């Protein structure tokens, strides 16, 4: 585990060091957007932080690469009506996804003594969980070599 995480962090750190940070939601996914009368309402602000705007936007993307590219185009077209978007930060999507995967496991580990956590994450302390987690990190290492999504806005 330490070997793969060290490899990932060595690859990711230089990319993040030059990235401008702004206030972001920090956990902006479809489950944290409630819709009423065709108006989105964002909830769950306990993870607000400073980060690159793409951190909030990539979590709204799903599906295969073509689907994500199309969704990204729609999101960035709308986003740029209010604020300029630095397309060079598209290269951060997979590094940020990797950090989120690592952070999620660390978050569970930090809270493991809370009686609710073993109930909510019953496989966390199993070999299977950690085998799958390491496999996901290895897949992310390969994804870091893939070209980023493109935006033609």
Language model features with spans:
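Active-site activation/catalytic loop segments of kinase-like enzymes and analogous catalytic loops
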Residues: 53-85, 100-116
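An alpha-helical support segment within catalytic cores of ATP-dependent transferases
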Residues: 1-26, 149-150
